[in-house]
């Protein structure tokens, strides 16, 4: 079992939920993964790393710190590593469903994207 890959995938999968804020992480499958990620972080120093990720989830340096520490901790807790591995595909699919508000941006989005539009949809300036 490659703990570094599991840790990296877990942090990548949970980051969109953390960026959205507490209301998103507190429900559903994201909550389950987040609890599994936090489980091996028991010392005060380890908990500080998790708190830092909660505060600045889009900081790549912080994500890297969590990935390295999580990888080390999962080596000692293979059961949690297996649970995270099993949950990752479901969470990654859920994370693809992102709500984006683009307002007054004058930007163009291109690429192979599946976009569902709900609510008001206005093309051009109001």
Please give the residue ranges for each predicted region.
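Short amphipathic alpha-helical segments that predominantly mediate membrane engagement
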Residues: 1-7, 31-113, 117-126
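Low-complexity, intrinsically disordered, cysteine-poor segments enriched in small/polar
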Residues: 13, 17, 24, 28, ...
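Disorder-to-helix initiation segments
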Residues: 1-18, 22
């Amino acid at each position: 079992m490659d703990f570094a890959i599991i840790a990296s995938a877990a942090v990548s999968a949970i980051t969109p939920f953390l960026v959205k804020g507490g209301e998103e992480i507190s429900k559903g499958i994201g909550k389950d993964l987040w609890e599994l990620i936090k489980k091996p972080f028991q010392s005060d120093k380890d908990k500080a790393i998790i708190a830092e990720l909660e505060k600045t989830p889009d900081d790549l340096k912080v994500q890297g710190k969590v990935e390295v520490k999580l990888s080390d901790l999962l080596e000692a807790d293979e059961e949690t590593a297996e649970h995270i591995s099993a949950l990752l595909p479901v969470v990654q699919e859920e994370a693809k469903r992102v709500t984006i508000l683009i307002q007054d941006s004058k930007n163009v989005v291109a690429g192979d994207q599946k976009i569902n539009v709900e609510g008001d949809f206005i093309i051009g300036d109001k």
